[in-house]
UniProtKB/Swiss-Prot annotation:
InterPro entries, A to Z: AAA+_ATPase, ATPase_AAA_core, DNA_pol3_clamp-load_cplx_C, DNA_Rep/Repair_Clamp_Loader, P-loop_NTPase, Rep_factorC_C, RFC_lid
Keyword Ribonucleoprotein part of the UniProt annotation: no
Family per similarity comment: Belongs to the activator 1 small subunits family. RfcS subfamily.
GO biological process: DNA repair; DNA-templated DNA replication
GO MF: ATP binding; ATP hydrolysis activity; DNA binding; DNA clamp loader activity
Keyword set, alphabetical order: ATP-binding, DNA replication, Nucleotide-binding
Entry binding sites for ATP: G47, P48, P49, G50, T51, G52, K53, T54
Name recorded for this polypeptide: Putative replication factor C small subunit L510
Any single Pfam family the record assigns to this protein: Rep_fac_C
Amino acid sequence: MIDDESVPWIEKYRPKKLEDITQSQNLLDLFKNSTKKGEMTHFLFYGPPGTGKTSAILAMGREIFKEHFQNRVIEFNASDDRGINAVREKITNEAKKYVAEIKLEDGTIIPSYKIIILDEADSMTDEAQDALRVIIEQYSTATRFCFICNYITKITDAIKSRCSSVYFKKLSDECMVEKLNDISLKESMELPKNILHTIIDVSNGDMRKAIMLLQNFKYTYNFKKNLTKKLKDMTLLELKTILFMTKKSSITSTISEEDVYEISASITLDKAKGIIDDTIDCNNIVEVSNLSKKIIAMGFPIDNILTQLNKCILESNKLDVNQISKIIIYSGDILLKMKECGNEYIQLLNYLAYVNRVSKHFD
């Protein structure tokens, strides 16, 4: 039996039913109608990460197949096998398997098809997607496909034309706070609303990331809650945690927003604002370069730093609307280069140098 403590919270608290999914009612009604009739079409789910795309199709599978769910729903992560060979071998072998209609004792009919889920489908090559088009047509009676992606523009027209496209919008802060508060109470954590809002802020609206961060946050929460415990009553793990935490400059018994930023490997907005102010005040590229080196030495992931810097840019009173627009657009290119394995120091220097130039009306 798997220890409950070892189960990732994103799986432990994944919605099992359609009504538990936080999305628009029209979307849920569409899914419920499909499950009631058992006449599911091919789907293409797209939208920001952590908005319930995978949870929705899994919940639909449970509604349609009941106790036969495990045998009728097959998941593939397209980012692992993104080429045509994976399509020809793994996916084709599953798609061509025929399954029989089953009638349960209560009269419920389990339809004679299965569901293949292709997560991160936008990472598949165009060649692999073209091969899938043939498979969809050939085995549509035995298999229903559900493509899941963040960017629909990376899906070929051949796939899009054969699927019902459904957009999953970003979850509201209120919905995320309610969900995180529910989870924290179930895990015996009483967190104030400002902490939950900070978790949402550093997660950028990604519910999956927020729940993972909340799970990591539990160790800090338990440590601070037990600061008043006597040493003889502490477990070995708690003693090791104290040894690690006492290496820091200061420890308080209260949970703070700084704890959230530290656990998420993000800089605070105040620190980000200071970096933007220092960048604007730089007089030459040498000063910008030295500032970039100091930021790199902080040890935070650069994409996290850039995200926080952009938030401060949007609220800056030292830049006009035109300057802010230029910087935000330019930062998109920087983040793309980061995802394509660009050098962190060079891309950070590129970003800060551009902010400096724009602030002085040189660009």
